[in-house]
Curated annotation (Swiss-Prot):
Transmembrane segments: none annotated. It comes from the Bacteria. This is UPF0246 protein Pnap_3166. It comes from Polaromonas naphthalenivorans (strain CJ2). Belongs to the UPF0246 family. It holds the Pfam family H2O2_YaaD. InterPro entries: YaaA. GO terms for cellular component: cytosol.
Length: 258
């Protein structure tokens, strides 16, 4: 099984990585192409394009200027350790050992507007470029057109060795949309996390994000190999609800009656 996650806007380059193991990102040529487009924009244009404050726009213009096609220990950090935010707080990769990170490297893909797909140990330079950004390039009017079938093609390559390939989708709709379903050959199983609020179950965004990270952590710790095993996830009070689920949509609930 391959697990898919979204990236995070928040980054941590201040905390040193606790492991030295790393790999080079796979789509460096495409990333350089996007950086060239971004470098040509003024802070005001970046602010408008990405709906950022002047301060954040300035920070990211500086990041684009500093970005280099050579990824080193001085300008990069392993993606799974660099991303911060709710998903990555749940995953808590800084407390995973080398063997666990090696397993994650083989079973986790992080979707990215700039990098396409990142493996956990891929070196990553700091950036901000959400997949839904309407960035016009030579390949189209947005990043979905820029990436086209490339991400799905890569996932097909990764899943090719599996007899019954399964993609466990823990990414947001914005990011999973970058995976061409027409091209993707694997079965897709989506996990949904709901909370009891008022008189019904609802998806609460920041809680669902954390739960996605917790699910990946559970998969890593238990080296999950089948969809059936996903149903055993019970971190922080969640419980699989068979009655609310479908074959390819697993619902986990927390709160009253769960």
């Amino acid at each position: 099984m391959l697990f898919l996650l979204s990236p995070a806007k928040s980054l941590d380059y201040a905390t040193p990585a606790h492991v030295a193991a790393h790999t080079q990102p796979l789509f460096k040529r495409q990333s350089a192409e996007l950086i060239a487009v971004l470098k040509a924009k003024s802070p005001q244009e970046i602010s408008s394009l990405m709906k950022l404050s002047d301060a954040l726009a300035g920070l990211n213009v500086a990041r684009y200027e500093a970005w280099s096609p050579a990824f080193t220990a001085h300008n990069s950090k392993q993606a799974v350790l660099a991303f911060n935010g709710d998903v990555y707080a749940g995953l808590d990769a800084k407390t995973l050992g080398e063997a666990q990170l090696a397993w994650a490297q083989d079973h986790l893909c992080i979707l990215s507007g700039l990098y396409g797909v990142l493996r956990p140990l891929d070196w990553m330079q700091p950036y901000r470029l959400e997949m839904g950004t309407a960035l016009v390039t030579g390949r189209g009017k947005n990043l979905y057109q820029f990436w086209g079938a490339q991400i799905a093609d890569y996932l097909n390559e990764r899943a090719a060795t599996d007899v019954s390939p399964v993609i466990v989708n823990l990414a947001s709709e914005e990011y999973f949309k970058s995976v061409s379903r027409k091209v993707l050959k694997a079965r897709v199983v989506t996990c949904v996390f709901e909370e009891w609020r008022g008189d019904k179950y609802k998806i609460i965004s920041f809680m669902a994000k954390r739960a996605r990270g917790l699910m990946v952590r559970y998969a890593i710790e238990n080296r999950l190999a089948t969809v059936e095993k996903l149903k055993g996830f019970e971190a922080e009070g969640y419980c699989f609800d068979a009655s609310a689920s479908a074959v390819d949509r697993l619902v986990f609930r927390r709160g009253q009656g769960a």
